[in-house]
């Protein structure tokens, strides 16, 4: 009654009607809740594991896709022994870049001379290991190494990286005019060694731009047309489209335009010219003994060449390679970095080592000045603009300008996001060069450009403001010393057993090696 066809449907099922299905027995009766059988529970569990496996498989596929081209160049594991084993003097001259060894060298300097300039000092035994003077006195076999690294500046750089929560990273501060290192810091030198080559990322664009300036006799006619996302690259985007957005060389550098630099590498330069430029800049040789040489991956297609010229893949360099770039940006000459002021034997006599070689001309001064001028756009309105401005939008260095370049790329061995910054300041007349490289994981706190900006602040700024002359407190004379040691001059080891006085019994204190 009152149910019509629906009521007849229930009554036609064995005479049980609505009661068969539990209907009509009261509105407040609790409904039965479904329960999984043992088989059902196992099915759900297996399905859950399958979903997790799919997610992990997709992640692994993504990682493999990201590193597919990088896998062409086999790399030794970072925990392996350093390559290019050199003579004992090479290990002797390895600077105290880790925190623990830095603190030891700091204390040794105070023990040696509390009133001396704030540089780092170590005693090295005949095996090339740091040693503590027994009873406060040096052994006759020990050698005292006085580094050019400034103790106060190095401590400040360590603090900047600590505040930035940089777990694996390197920072170098140097005088680009002389190649003299003022600070050399590594937060995790065992797992992320500074002597290994890592993806160069968009820092390569600086060398590509230098090659374009050489080929085109200036940048007036260098421009490109691109479509879509300037950072995305594929085979179709290697050729200029019939219409799209236009960019010149300076803007492409400032915004790190991958499409433009890949087009220029393919259509304007070619592989031989690009390789020759990398070789001329010294990036295919070790920057100093004991460090890896830069390496170019195999170039088989136009896309490989485009990726090399834009920095998306194909080249690995060490932080010291990039540090040497600051000297070329300063006046077009390549000056090898160095960090030893002098070496003294156990009797207090300076060991005279080979004189430094003359700087090598890489590009003329006019083109170097123009390239440096274009790189100012990176910090003024490009990819590093936010790093060099305060939260209120004011320049962090006042009227001082910085010429620089950013770079970031996901790489392997170890896997992570490699983020670079290289810069010189003041851009008009560089006195300081800064290089920062950090390996970022899934969680990171500060960009390398932000860390570099803080380092520049420490160098140039005080309570009275920022000025170029403030750099003199770090780059000034450290006192009487022999001619600075150029690391590459130590191809043949000089042992104390081979040394004789210049004039026997003269007491001159100057030591020379036997021929």
Which residues fall in each region the model found?
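A short, well-structured edge-of-sheet supersecondary motif
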Residues: 161-189
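Active-site-proximal helix/loop microenvironment
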Residues: 194-203, 286-348, 356
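Active-site SXXK
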Residues: 156-161, 179, 197-224, 252, ...
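N-terminal Lys/Arg-rich, disordered targeting/topogenic segments
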Residues: 1-39
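Active-site-adjacent helix/loop patches that line small-molecule binding or acyl-intermediate pockets
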Residues: 168-177, 207, 222-234, 240-295, ...
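Extracytoplasmic/periplasmic proteins that interact with beta-lactams or build/remodel peptidoglycan
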Residues: 41-47, 53-170, 354-357, 468-493
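Conserved active-site-proximal loop/helix segments of enzymes involved in bacterial cell-wall
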Residues: 223-253, 289-291, 324-392, 462-490, ...
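Short, Gly/Ser/Thr-enriched beta-strand-loop segments that form substrate-interacting elements
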Residues: 391-427
């Amino acid at each position: 009654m009152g149910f019509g066809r629906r009521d007849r449907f229930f009554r036609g099922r064995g005479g049980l009607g609505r009661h068969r299905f539990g209907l009509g027995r009261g509105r407040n009766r609790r409904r039965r809740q479904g329960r999984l059988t043992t088989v059902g529970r196992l099915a759900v569990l297996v399905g859950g594991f399958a979903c997790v496996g799919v997610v992990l498989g997709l992640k692994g596929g993504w990682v493999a896709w990201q590193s597919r081209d990088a896998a062409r160049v086999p790399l030794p594991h970072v925990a392996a022994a350093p390559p290019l084993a050199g003579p004992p003097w090479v290990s002797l001259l390895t600077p105290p870049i880790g925190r623990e060894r830095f603190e030891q060298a700091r204390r040794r300097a105070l023990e040696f001379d509390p009133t001396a300039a704030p540089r780092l000092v170590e005693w090295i035994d005949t095996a090339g290991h740091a040693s503590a003077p027994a009873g406060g006195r040096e052994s006759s076999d020990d050698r005292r190494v006085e580094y050019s690294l400034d103790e106060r500046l190095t401590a400040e750089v360590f603090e900047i990286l600590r505040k930035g929560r940089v777990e694996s990273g390197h920072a170098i501060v140097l005088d680009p005019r002389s190649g003299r290192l003022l600070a050399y810091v590594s937060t995790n030198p065992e797992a992320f060694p500074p002597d290994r080559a890592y993806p160069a990322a968009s820092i390569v664009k600086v060398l590509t731009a230098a090659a374009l300036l050489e080929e085109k006799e200036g940048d007036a006619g260098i421009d490109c047309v691109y479509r879509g996302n300037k950072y995305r690259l594929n085979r179709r985007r290697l050729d200029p489209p019939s219409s799209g957005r236009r960019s010149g060389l300076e803007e492409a550098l400032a915004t790190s335009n991958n499409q433009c630099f890949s087009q220029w590498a393919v259509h304007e330069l070619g592989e031989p010219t690009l390789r020759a430029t990398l070789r001329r800049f010294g990036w295919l040789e070790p920057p100093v003994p004991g460090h890896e040489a830069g390496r170019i991956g195999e170039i088989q297609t136009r896309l490989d060449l485009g990726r090399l010229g834009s920095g998306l893949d194909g080249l690995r360099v060490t932080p010291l390679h990039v540090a040497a770039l600051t000297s070329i940006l300063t006046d077009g000459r390549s000056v090898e970095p160095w960090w030893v002021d002098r070496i003294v034997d156990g009797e207090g006599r300076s060991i005279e080592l080979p004189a430094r070689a003359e700087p090598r001309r890489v590009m003329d001064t006019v083109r170097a000045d123009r390239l440096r001028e274009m790189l100012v756009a990176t910090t003024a309105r490009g990819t590093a603009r936010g790093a060099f401005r305060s939260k209120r939008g004011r320049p962090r260095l006042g009227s001082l300008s910085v010429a620089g370049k950013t770079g970031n790329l996901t790489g392997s061995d170890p896997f992570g996001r490699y983020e670079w910054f290289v810069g010189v300041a003041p851009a008009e007349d560089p006195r300081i060069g800064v290089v920062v490289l950090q390996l970022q994981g899934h969680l990171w706190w500060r960009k390398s450009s932000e860390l570099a900006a803080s380092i520049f602040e420490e160098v140039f700024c005080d309570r009275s403001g920022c000025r170029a002359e403030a750099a003199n407190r770090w780059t000034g004379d450290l006192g009487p010393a022999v001619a600075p040691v150029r690391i590459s001059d130590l191809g043949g080891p000089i042992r104390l057993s081979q040394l004789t006085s210049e004039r026997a019994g003269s007491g001159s204190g100057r030591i020379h090696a036997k021929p």
